């Protein structure tokens, strides 16, 4: 038996906590026997004193074990359970292609996803732009879809890592969100509750990233790889670029449309293709579905070329109560905005810089995201045909096409786009899409 205040005191004085002390505290958060003040105090001591790697692993495992941990053994699946987690960005629609692509190659992806947060789009919000799409199937149905289709993308239920929800809510109001051990535990508790064999982390870098600097993004990626492997899940991370919108579109229905076009081969944005392929390669290698990069890429290209990946996406949509012919007739089902019109730069030039975060916030302002949890989303709004860094723009080539609910909203969005995109006389040097791979 421990006392919460003694655990706080020990950490306050700079000592490492034991696994038992951490589990006691986290179970108390779940059971409401630890007060909000005590959670805040421990969070602040961790913020200032950091945690050792064993402490980080213990914290993550305790938070994972505060609720249900999925177990897939009874399904006798003939492939690995793998998933991807992204720290979030703008136009980051990789999950919608990656899940079906890896499933078509023999993996099983029980993806528990989130809603939009701040300027970043949420995978669940995107999928809910598909009529009827059910993001909360019951446990048995979730398992059936994984067994039959190979991939399902669902929302987090209250039974998964419940301690994290309360811990995060307190961190949010006490300026302790940006602590690497706490971020690591929060992300991984939910992911490891999926019962994974392997995980790949997509840690964004740049103006639209969650972490403000390259160094902090790198530190987070290294922490996650260290902790997840310490918890027994094969994990690698990629540092990928978010200095511009990743896809050609940003929003909800517009990104789903781009995902379908990507899978069918109708249109593939080259940067989106690079990042999606790189993440899929990691999943195939970590999941032992491919021995090396070349074999993984060949398998992934094959399921894109032969239509298998698109077929898996269609089956997932149908299994989650969406239209059975969605891939073939997506244009018929996805909502369209009242006003669709291009915005042009005031001068000619080359796109040299993009405030990706501001573009994400512009989508939120148009109604494509939430300012508070109770807000409803307008799934039809957003941007398409986004100019990329290095593109030449003028009176013929727009900065973006804006999908808005009315003229007033379009004008506000146009102002935001012009302010967020800087032009120069010559094209900037191109930046990589993937900066670095981090493994144990």
UniProtKB/Swiss-Prot annotation:
<dbReference type="Pfam" id="PF00591">
    <property type="entry name" value="Glycos_transf_3"/>
</dbReference>
<comment type="subunit">
    <text>Homodimer.</text>
</comment>
<dbReference type="InterPro" id="IPR013102">
    <property type="entry name" value="PYNP_C"/>
</dbReference>
<dbReference type="GO" id="GO:0009032">
    <property type="term" value="F:thymidine phosphorylase activity"/>
</dbReference>
<comment type="function">
    <text>The enzymes which catalyze the reversible phosphorolysis of pyrimidine nucleosides are involved in the degradation of these compounds and in their utilization as carbon and energy sources, or in the rescue of pyrimidine bases for nucleotide synthesis.</text>
</comment>
<dbReference type="Pfam" id="PF07831">
    <property type="entry name" value="PYNP_C"/>
</dbReference>
<comment type="similarity">
    <text>Belongs to the thymidine/pyrimidine-nucleoside phosphorylase family.</text>
</comment>
<dbReference type="InterPro" id="IPR017459">
    <property type="entry name" value="Glycosyl_Trfase_fam3_N_dom"/>
</dbReference>
<dbReference type="InterPro" id="IPR036320">
    <property type="entry name" value="Glycosyl_Trfase_fam3_N_dom_sf"/>
</dbReference>
<dbReference type="InterPro" id="IPR000312">
    <property type="entry name" value="Glycosyl_Trfase_fam3"/>
</dbReference>
<dbReference type="GO" id="GO:0006206">
    <property type="term" value="P:pyrimidine nucleobase metabolic process"/>
</dbReference>
<dbReference type="GO" id="GO:0004645">
    <property type="term" value="F:1,4-alpha-oligoglucan phosphorylase activity"/>
</dbReference>
<dbReference type="GO" id="GO:0005829">
    <property type="term" value="C:cytosol"/>
</dbReference>
<dbReference type="Pfam" id="PF02885">
    <property type="entry name" value="Glycos_trans_3N"/>
</dbReference>
<dbReference type="InterPro" id="IPR018090">
    <property type="entry name" value="Pyrmidine_PPas_bac/euk"/>
</dbReference>
<comment type="pathway">
    <text>Pyrimidine metabolism; dTMP biosynthesis via salvage pathway; dTMP from thymine: step 1/2.</text>
</comment>
<dbReference type="InterPro" id="IPR036566">
    <property type="entry name" value="PYNP-like_C_sf"/>
</dbReference>
<keyword id="KW-0808">Transferase</keyword>
<dbReference type="InterPro" id="IPR035902">
    <property type="entry name" value="Nuc_phospho_transferase"/>
</dbReference>
<protein>
    <recommendedName>
        <fullName>Thymidine phosphorylase</fullName>
        <ecNumber>2.4.2.4</ecNumber>
    </recommendedName>
</protein>
<dbReference type="InterPro" id="IPR013465">
    <property type="entry name" value="Thymidine_Pase"/>
</dbReference>
<dbReference type="InterPro" id="IPR000053">
    <property type="entry name" value="Thymidine/pyrmidine_PPase"/>
</dbReference>
<dbReference type="GO" id="GO:0046104">
    <property type="term" value="P:thymidine metabolic process"/>
</dbReference>
<dbReference type="InterPro" id="IPR017872">
    <property type="entry name" value="Pyrmidine_PPase_CS"/>
</dbReference>
<keyword id="KW-0328">Glycosyltransferase</keyword>
């Amino acid at each position: 038996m421990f006392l919460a205040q003694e655990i706080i005191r020990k950490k306050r004085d700079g000592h490492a906590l034991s696994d038992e002390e951490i589990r006691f505290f986290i179970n108390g958060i779940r059971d409401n026997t630890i007060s909000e003040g005590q959670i805040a105090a421990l969070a602040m001591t961790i913020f200032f004193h950091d945690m050792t790697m064993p402490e980080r692993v213990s914290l993550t495992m305790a938070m994972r074990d505060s609720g249900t941990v999925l177990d897939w053994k009874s399904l006798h699946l003939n492939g690995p359970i793998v998933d991807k987690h992204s720290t979030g960005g703008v136009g980051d629609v990789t999950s919608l292609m990656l899940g079906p692509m890896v499933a078509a190659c023999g993996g099983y992806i029980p993806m528990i996803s989130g809603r939009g947060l701040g300027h970043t789009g949420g995978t669940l919000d995107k999928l809910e732009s598909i009529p009827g799409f059910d993001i909360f199937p019951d446990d048995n149905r979730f398992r059936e879809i994984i067994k039959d289709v190979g991939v399902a993308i669902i929302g987090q239920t209250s039974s998964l890592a419940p301690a994290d929800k309360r811990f995060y809510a307190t961190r949010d109001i006490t300026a302790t969100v940006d602590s690497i051990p706490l971020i690591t535990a929060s992300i991984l508790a939910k992911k490891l509750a999926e019962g994974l064999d392997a995980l790949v982390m997509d840690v964004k870098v740049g103006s639209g990233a969650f972490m403000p600097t390259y160094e902090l993004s790198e530190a987070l990626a290294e922490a996650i790889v260290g902790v997840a492997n310490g918890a027994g899940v094969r994990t690698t991370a990629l540092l990928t670029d978010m200095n511009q919108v990743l896809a050609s579109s940003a929003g909800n229905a517009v990104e789903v449309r781009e995902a379908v076009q990507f899978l069918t081969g109708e249109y593939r944005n080259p940067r989106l293709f690079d990042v999606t392929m790189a993440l899929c390669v990691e999943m195939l290698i970590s999941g032992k579905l491919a021995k090396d990069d070349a074999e993984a890429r060949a398998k992934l290209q094959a399921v894109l070329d032969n239509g298998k990946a698109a077929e898996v996406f269609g089956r997932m949509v149908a299994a989650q109560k969406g239209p059975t012919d969605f891939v073939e007739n997506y244009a018929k089902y996805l909502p369209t905005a009242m006003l669709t019109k291009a915005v042009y730069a005031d001068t000619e030039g080359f796109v040299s810089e993009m405030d990706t975060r501001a573009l994400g916030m512009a989508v939120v302002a148009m109604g494509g995201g939430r300012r508070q949890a109770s807000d409803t989303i307008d799934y039809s709004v957003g941007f398409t045909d986004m100019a990329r860094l290095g593109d030449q723009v003028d009176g013929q080539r727009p900065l973006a096409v804006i999908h808005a609910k009315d003229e007033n909203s379009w004008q506000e969005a146009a102002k935001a786009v012009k302010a967020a995109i800087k032009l120069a006389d010559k094209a900037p040097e191109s930046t990589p899409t993937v900066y670095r791979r981090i493994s144990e």
